[in-house]
Curated annotation (Swiss-Prot):
Pro-piece positions: 199-223
Localisation per UniProt entry: Secreted, Cell wall; Membrane
GO cellular component terms listed in the entry, alphabetical order: extracellular region; fungal-type cell wall; prospore membrane; side of membrane
Membrane topology: Lipid-anchor; GPI-anchor
Organism from which the protein derives: Saccharomyces cerevisiae (strain ATCC 204508 / S288c)
Lipid attachment site numbers (GPI-anchor amidated asparagine): N198
Signal peptide: 1-20
Function: Involved in sporulation. Essential for completion of the nuclear division.
Any coiled-coil regions, as ranges: none
Post-translational modifications reported in the UniProt record: The GPI-anchor is attached to the protein in the endoplasmic reticulum and serves to target the protein to the cell surface. There, the glucosamine-inositol phospholipid moiety is cleaved off and the GPI-modified mannoprotein is covalently attached via its lipidless GPI glycan remnant to the 1,6-beta-glucan of the outer cell wall layer.
Protein name: Sporulation-specific protein 19
Length: 223
């Protein structure tokens, strides 16, 4: 009889620990011997009960019942019908089975085409856009140089000013500009219908010839 009481007590402790609807247990599985109470076919756990802490009526009830739940000893003892425990166990098993099936179905639906067609297209578009951006950032550095010559003639200073603008594109969306200015003396005489400009302050053959002719004319008029 004593052995049966201990077996039922261990079963009842498991019931109150798992479901917790009827009572609170003050003993943990570690205090009762690890996880040995998880299986009813294990050897019974020996629970020592201090007879001085329990009244005589409760001891008599312990000796005559198979359905017992030990709560916070030595305050009170609560009894439960074994059929009620079986119903609670069955209800718990059904609930756990439903939860497992729901989680598995949800995972299967999300991993095997559970998304709508529009959602899948949006995901594909976002992925392609991100891949394109990464391709731009990871491309080789290239340079594009454009030169523009701006020629300004200043009559006051007789200067030919030439500015070269270099536009360098280092990578997408980043462009640097640099300017190099140069100046050369410039004469006010240029040859029309020709492919060149007079860009020096020295006399040309035409100027020398005109000077010689003017000198001869002045000499003739003087004499």
């Amino acid at each position: 009889m004593k052995k049966q009481i201990l077996i039922v007590a261990a079963q009842s402790i498991l019931c109150s620990t798992v479901f917790g609807e009827r009572s609170n247990v003050g003993l943990s599985t570690e205090e009762l011997g690890g996880d040995s109470i998880l299986y009813f076919n294990e050897d019974p756990i020996v629970i020592e009960i201090d007879k001085k802490a329990i009244d005589k009526k409760t001891l008599e009830q312990l000796a005559s019942t198979r359905d017992v739940v030990l709560t916070d000893l030595p305050d009170t003892l609560e009894f439960i019908d074994f059929n009620e425990y079986a119903k609670m166990k069955s209800k718990s098993d059904m609930l756990l089975e439903y939860i497992n099936e729901y989680e598995f179905d949800d995972f299967e639906r999300s991993s095997e085409g559970g998304l709508e067609e529009e959602e899948e297209e949006d995901l594909i578009y976002d992925f392609n856009a991100q891949a394109e951006d990464l391709g731009k950032l990871g491309s080789n550095i290239y340079e594009v140089v454009e030169e523009k010559n701006i020629v300004n003639t200043y009559d006051g200073n007789l200067i030919n000013a030439s500015t070269t603008e270099s536009t360098t594109t280092i990578r997408p969306f980043v462009t640097s500009h640099s300017y190099v200015a140069s100046s050369t003396p410039y004469s006010n005489i240029s040859s029309l219908n020709e492919d060149y400009d007079n860009a020096s302050n020295f006399l040309t053959p035409t100027t020398v010839a005109l000077a010689v002719l003017l000198t001869i004319l002045l000499f003739i008029q003087a004499y």
